[in-house]
Amino acid sequence: MLRVPKFLPRLARQAGVVPSHMSGASSMFRNLPGASNGISSQLRYKSGEVKGAVIGIDLGTTNSCLAVMEGKQAKVIENAEGARTTPSHVAFTKDGERLVGMPAKRQAVTNSANTFYATKRLIGRRFDDPEVKKDITNLSYKVVKASNGDAWVSSTDGKVYSPSQIGAFILMKMKETAEAYLNTPVKNAVVTVPAYFNDSQRQATKDAGQIAGLNVLRVINEPTAAALAYGMDKTEDKIIAVYDLGGGTFDISILEIQKGVFEVKSTNGDTLLGGEDFDNHIVNFLVAEFKKDSGIDIRKDNIAMQRLKEAAEKAKCELSSSQQTDINLPYLTMDAAGPQHMNLKLTRSKLESLVGDLIKRTIQPCQKALSDAEVSKSEIGEVLLVGGMTRMPKVQSTVQELFGRQPSRSVNPDEAVAVGAAVQGGVLAGDVTDVLLLDVTPLSLGIETLGGVFTRLISRNTTIPTKKSQVFSTASDGQTQVEIKVHQGEREMANDNKLLGSFTLVGIPPAPRGVPQIEVVFDIDANGIVHVSAKDKGTGKEQQIVIQSSGGLSKDEIENMIKKAEEYATADKQKRELIEIVNQGESIVHDTETKMEEFKSQLPAEECEKLKKEIADLRTLLANKETADLEEVRKATSSLQQSSLKLFELAYKKMSAERESNAGAGSSDSSSSSDTSGEAKKEEKN
């Protein structure tokens, strides 16, 4: 255990410095109008390492979005289905096929136990967390305790996946979409996370990018990204609030925009508050209403519950633009009396009463963010609404009451975060040179000291990157080692905060308590990820770690998941190639049979029989296309194509010869007729 020595006053011994390349950046840019040029040249210098396009990805709870810089503008890229956002769903079919996005969401009703959604709410979390336990009751798939204590998901065939893996499958889909659009391999990305994500969740998101084969250059906060999207083409200086209520999380950030410098003043939020919770409240209401009308509790009917969830989401969206909607679900379930249907009306006012407590939960974080930023609501020049839930009229009116002004609709709530991520990607690549982003750490960081007290080294809303140190000492006589327990949170006792990880500094020479001097250094990088070191100043012995969660993914686990992701990518490619060659084979069979019928009088019977056998052989292969060998199908298809071309070439030659023969005979007859006619005319003349 460590103690803060009395002879080393904490404030006197605490140093707060940013890395040399950022030193003084915050104050310098607040006071010097022309200073952005210095930063621009600095960013250009740093960008030399980044080669190729940098894509911006909003990895959302409900939907994900992708953007890339084209010149000075960010462009949202449509996926293969033609949509600008992709559902954050991953499913595994009975035959082992992996589906991502809309194809996965479409089959969720009939395959709910193997369709994974909203896994972002599990990422970087422990299975025993009370929040996870509460969430599990609303999920259609199984959540299990991994060997490291984290919350993982399990399919019906017993395979388990970490939330980082599921996130990686979605990121792989975004990567493929970008590569198809740019027509070049893509490696670099900026990925967004909720501002209130802790270190474990940020690290797990970065792991997801690594598993997907991406080099995640930066992890940035979603509200900050939205502010970048908003402020890219704005020239006036102002303080803005970003109210971000998405599918699974809520964030509020206060930023000051001044001559291209985006400085986050404060951030707050709730990582378990979003559209999923709104949907669950509606589902609970529908279940209760159905039980009241029919006497049937349908909670154990997975298909019925999945249909209710879809209906709840649809009704919620419709009530943003209309006062009332009908929920009609025929054949929802069966009982002894026969099929039971659901048919009820849901009004906007009823919806607002159902979710009123959820909307109220966003108020306190907003007030706290204003207080931490030392800004009054009258100083807020603009309030940006981000996230699909901000389309709800009640949410908009709550924001208006809270900030005393009409919220702005100048950014697309679904796309702004991805656009901002692309802008930051442009900054890192050196394509955007007039923007500097100064973000903050959302939660205080510190260590456990004598008596279980949480001693802060870095307070919340400190601009990052940052580095701070403090000297501690031993808590007992003759102590030769100390355990450094790193926590994150705002409570005064360490156990009430999130334990990020721990390590031990050994080899301290025995001495009376309070004599050894142990310097603990916290270093937070631009991604918000924590690096911690401890050094015995007497011996010079040092121990350092990059904080993973006390569970988290090990290097070996990440490498194994990368390998599995590559295997899935290979399998997907082979499956796609097989489908393409099967389609080609079926097309050639159809065309060959059509032409054989059309030219049967011109084709040798013996050759036709050979061709029919080849068609029959290929048909047999195509009938078992799920298990067919790709090369075998390709070979048979190519053989039939070559044989049919040769045969039809003979037919065309034969037809051509016949036409020429007929044309020659016709010409001879015409000439003979002409001569006879001439002789007759001569006789008449005579």
Curated annotation (Swiss-Prot):
Protein name as catalogued: Heat shock 70 kDa protein cognate 5
Query: What PROSITE patterns does UniProt report for this protein, alphabetically?
Result: HSP70_1, HSP70_2, HSP70_3
Read off the HAMAP family from this record.
Answer: DnaK (MF_00332)
Entry keyword Nucleotide-binding: yes
Question: Could you tell me where the Low complexity compositional bias lies?
Answer: 667-677
Highest taxon of source? Eukaryota
Q: Which UniProt keywords apply?
A: ATP-binding, Nucleotide-binding, Phosphoprotein, Stress response
Q: What do the Gene Ontology cellular component annotations say? A: cytoplasm; mitochondrial matrix; mitochondrion; PAM complex, Tim23 associated import motor
Cite a single GO BP annotation.
chaperone cofactor-dependent protein refolding
What residues bear Phosphothreonine in this entry? T86
Which CDD domains is this protein grouped with? ASKHA_NBD_HSP70_HSPA9
Instruction: Give the similarity note.
Output: Belongs to the heat shock protein 70 family.
Kindly list the GO molecular function terms attached to this UniProt entry: ATP binding; ATP hydrolysis activity; ATP-dependent protein folding chaperone; enzyme regulator activity; heat shock protein binding; mitochondrial protein-transporting ATPase activity; protein folding chaperone; unfolded protein binding
Outline the segment boundaries, as ranges, of region: Disordered. 657-686
Say yes or no: keyword Cytoplasm present: no
Query: InterPro entries, per this entry?
Result: ATPase_NBD, Chaperone_DnaK, Heat_shock_70_CS, HSP70_C_sf, HSP70_peptide-bd_sf, Hsp_70_fam
Pfam families under this entry? HSP70
Q: Which organism is it from?
A: Drosophila melanogaster (Fruit fly)
